Curated annotation (Swiss-Prot):
Chief localization: mitochondrion
CDD domains: Cytochrome_b_N
Subunit structure: The cytochrome bc1 complex contains 11 subunits: 3 respiratory subunits (MT-CYB, CYC1 and UQCRFS1), 2 core proteins (UQCRC1 and UQCRC2) and 6 low-molecular weight proteins (UQCRH/QCR6, UQCRB/QCR7, UQCRQ/QCR8, UQCR10/QCR9, UQCR11/QCR10 and a cleavage product of UQCRFS1). This cytochrome bc1 complex then forms a dimer.
GO biological process: mitochondrial electron transport, ubiquinol to cytochrome c
UniProt protein name: Cytochrome b
Additional observations: Heme 1 (or BL or b562) is low-potential and absorbs at about 562 nm, and heme 2 (or BH or b566) is high-potential and absorbs at about 566 nm.
Cofactor note: Binds 2 heme b groups non-covalently.
Taxonomic classification: Eukaryota, Metazoa, Chordata, Craniata, Vertebrata
Family recorded in the similarity comment: Belongs to the cytochrome b family.
Length: 267
């Protein structure tokens, strides 16, 4: 098995990335969040795929299709809330991951950092278009307000907003294209994640001391696979507590009111 792991064209890539990878011996729990982000991304793609099987991206039926998922689809409520709260966990991990990078000077690894910035912005875009899909009041007015920010661009602003909307307001065309973007962007994110890892493994990871750790490396497996597994268990525990006990605590009650272009949410 060891010979195959080290020589097989596909397995040796995995081997050099997750098994025999030389890793600094002193990286702390702040370094766990990269793997947690990978887990979050997998959860989001899987739950999102199953949601897409039942969702309809039409203004007349989008809201009721989400209700249908929660009420009529087997474990649809679980899939929907895993996806919604999984997105929140994704961003919590993302902020900590970036914060650790700033605190410990990981921005010195410029290629890895720049791909990370692209990942951050792409994830924000994905979350934004995804929030519009349930077509509640906050979905509709959130989309209206955020896209309207582009109208501040001199000369081309108004035309740009109408181009993104596909009309003169957030409507059917907007919802359809946002669903298309929301479906494709996670796969683009996955591709960028591989590039992010590629650049990271070119230089090796940073470590809390900030010193060169080439003289003190240990194999990634079993040491950091076990450490990451603990992080994953804790992440899933927090996620499941949210999903099973407090599924709506991070959401807005106004999004349970269908989108109405004639009324802004009560505030």
């Amino acid at each position: 098995m060891t010979i195959m792991r080290k020589n097989h064209p596909l397995l040796k890539i995995i081997n050099h990335s997750f098994i025999d990878l030389p890793t600094p011996s002193n990286i702390s729990s702040w370094w766990n969040f990269g793997s947690l982000l990978g887990i979050c991304l997998m959860i989001q793609i899987l739950t999102g795929l199953f949601l897409a099987m039942h969702y309809t991206s039409d203004t007349a039926t989008a809201f009721s299709s989400v209700t249908h998922i929660c009420r009529d689809v087997n474990y649809g409520w679980l899939i929907r809330y895993l996806h919604a709260n999984g997105a929140s966990m994704f961003f919590i991990c993302l902020f900590i991951h970036v914060g650790r990078g700033i605190y410990y000077g990981s921005y010195m690894l410029s290629e890895t950092w720049n791909i990370g910035i692209i990942l951050f912005l792409t994830t924000m875009a994905t979350a934004f278009v995804g929030y519009v899909l349930p077509w509640g009041q906050m979905s509709f007015w959130g989309a209206t307000v955020i896209t309207n920010l582009l109208s501040a661009i001199p000369y081309i602003g108004t035309s740009l907003v109408e181009w993104i909307w596909g009309g003169f307001s957030v409507d059917k065309a907007t919802l359809t294209r946002f669903f298309a973007f929301h479906f494709i962007l996670p796969f683009i994110i996955t591709a960028f994640v591989l590039v992010h890892l590629l650049f990271l493994h070119e230089t090796g990871s940073n470590n809390p001391s900030g010193l060169n750790s080439n003289s003190d490396k240990i194999p990634f497996h079993p040491y950091y696979t076990i450490k990451d597994l603990l992080g994953v268990i804790l992440l899933l525990m927090v996620l499941m507590i949210l999903v099973l006990f407090f599924p709506d605590v991070l959401g807005d009650p106004d999004n349970y009111t269908p989108a109405n272009p004639l009324n802004t949410p009560a505030h």
